[in-house]
């Protein structure tokens, strides 16, 4: 089986590339994203809309309520291995995402040395100003109701009604920033979806900056795998981390 690995920081266009490859090959895409395993935060976690998938198949490693917490990296890695084994009849599989902890689990596991062929594509952070422009556009889209999916702020307002979800939301990019913004401006969380345009723009910029901080962390902590445009065997677990 050929495993096509696409990884990189948030807002780098990984999902779009994965969808394009899936359209050309017909292969499924497995999301290497622990937060996207919670459908209740589909918007804030960056799950693509059904229309954006363009009839391609996207597989999540779990589907759980937020009250159960975010799946841990080791659990996600076990599910990933099961999914790859389940898809063994496929000619290829696309692995796409940016979970640092999950990718590092892969880098340490001997499973990925067991005869797969690899095509590795890493997307880079690049220029900070260009990143912030992309991130602002992404957050602006998250603040809109699209295809009947609630906005990020509506997801937050709804889930804030359940005390068990609050510490989890405070640990997720985007939601954490919105919660701090509400406290700073003496707003109730359920008021956030109705803030005026000026405050909304301030919050969009704040979340974009938080995404940049997260992207810098990802760039620092990702495993370093060679990128190869040919169908060459590549064993990620055999590679040394570049400091």
From Swiss-Prot:
Q: Which Gene Ontology molecular function entries are recorded, alphabetically?
A: AMP dimethylallyltransferase activity
The record's annotation in InterPro entries points to: P-loop_NTPase (IPR027417), Tzs (IPR002648)
- From the UniProt record, list the reaction(s) this protein catalyses: dimethylallyl diphosphate + AMP = N(6)-(dimethylallyl)adenosine 5'-phosphate + diphosphate
**What are the record keywords, sorted?**
Cytokinin biosynthesis, Plasmid, Transferase
Output the Gene3D superfamilies linked to this UniProt entry.
Crystal structure of tRNA isopentenylpyrophosphate transferase (bh2366) domain, P-loop containing nucleotide triphosphate hydrolases
Q: What this chain does, per the record? A: Transfers dimethylallyl groups to AMP as part of the biosynthesis of cytokinin phytohormones.
Please identify the protein, giving its name as recorded: Adenylate dimethylallyltransferase
Taxonomic lineage of this organism?
Answer: Bacteria, Pseudomonadati, Pseudomonadota, Alphaproteobacteria, Hyphomicrobiales
